Amino acid sequence: KKNGYAVDSSGKVAE
């Protein structure tokens, strides 16, 4: 998690 968002290994953010 980063800043309350889940971030995948490619750095894309999914809410």
Swiss-Prot record:
It is found in: Secreted. The keyword Secreted applies. Expressed by the venom gland. GO terms for molecular function: sodium channel regulator activity; toxin activity. The keyword Transmembrane does not apply. Its main location: secreted. One of its GO terms (cellular component) is extracellular region. Keywords: Ion channel impairing toxin, Neurotoxin, Secreted, Toxin, Voltage-gated sodium channel impairing toxin. Excitatory insect beta-toxins induce a spastic paralysis. They bind voltage-independently at site-4 of sodium channels (Nav) and shift the voltage of activation toward more negative potentials thereby affecting sodium channel activation and promoting spontaneous and repetitive firing. This toxin shows an evident analgesic effect on mice, but is devoid of mammalian toxicity. Belongs to the long (4 C-C) scorpion toxin superfamily. Sodium channel inhibitor family. Beta subfamily. This is Insect toxin BmK AngP1.
